Amino acid sequence: MSLTANGKANLATSPKTSISSEPIIIRRATLKDAPEMGRVGGRVYYDTPLTSWLWPHRAKYHAQYERHWIERRLALMLNPRNESYVACSSSGQIIGAAQFARLGDDAGAWKRIREIGVLRRVFMWVAAWVFWGYCKVRWWLEGGDKTQNKEAVETFASWCRVDGERYWGSHEERASRWHCQSLVLLPEWQGKGIGKKLMAVVMEKAQRDGVIIGLEASAKGEGLYTKLGFELLGRFTGEAGAVEDVGQGGMMIWYPEGYKKEASSEM
């Protein structure tokens, strides 16, 4: 599984639909792409049980709901450990996006950070703080977030911390990894191999670095990752599982070829 030298990947043609015959371009995302990346994510997850629980008033305050997604995309992109990619149709429309982070303190992780350059790292650090302050002030001026169930958001964050420590933090050997922070694809473009092409980007990097890939799979996304060779480490906490489809989704891991797996898959 690989991308062409110019970053393009063509879907197999099909006489049934014009969508399936369009050439798809996978490219590195820029900060200008963040708004559309956010809108794609907001649309993809709009009707999921988790979204309905966290943002019950998203229909009434749709602009705020979209802004959550856009701000998150930008915040991730301003981290020097992050790499973001978009999938575009032949017309240039962003139809999907993926964001990955190179975690750890190993030589490979620091080599990548150094390659970014000191000036760019300083710019990203300053921009991240300015953006954080801007977001705080803007939400304050609007009288706070009207889309959220604040108690649900705090509860969900606590579940994430528990699972993060259980599956990643308590396993020193998993600290050095690429982590898939987000993968979204518009519904009408799903099932055409585009998600695999986006994941191919990080799988090639992980194979080159000799490190694992970790991610949190939704109930719907678990099938894709399984086909790509990811293994399930464990389901989300019982409470989180009750919000999503019970018994589906969870923490998943991918091992590069030749990687010495852990002696135990204990969760």
Question: What do these predicted ranges mean?
Answer:
Residues 80-100, 184-186:
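Conserved beta-hairpin
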Residues 185, 191-204:
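Conserved acetyl-CoA-binding loop-helix of GNAT-fold acetyltransferases
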Residues 196, 208-210, 219-236:
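Conserved active-site alpha-helix within GNAT-family acetyltransferase domains
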Residues 56-84, 89, 163-169:
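Active-site rim helix/loop that mediates acceptor-substrate recognition in acyltransferases
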Residues 25-39:
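A short beta-loop-alpha structural element at the N-terminal edge
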Residues 176-178, 206-217:
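Conserved GNAT acetyl-CoA-binding A-motif
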Residues 99-184, 190, 239-246, 258-265:
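Conserved acyl-donor/pantetheine-binding loop and adjacent beta-alpha core of acyl/acetyltransferases
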Residues 231-251:
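Conserved catalytic-core motifs of GNAT/GCN5-like acyltransferases
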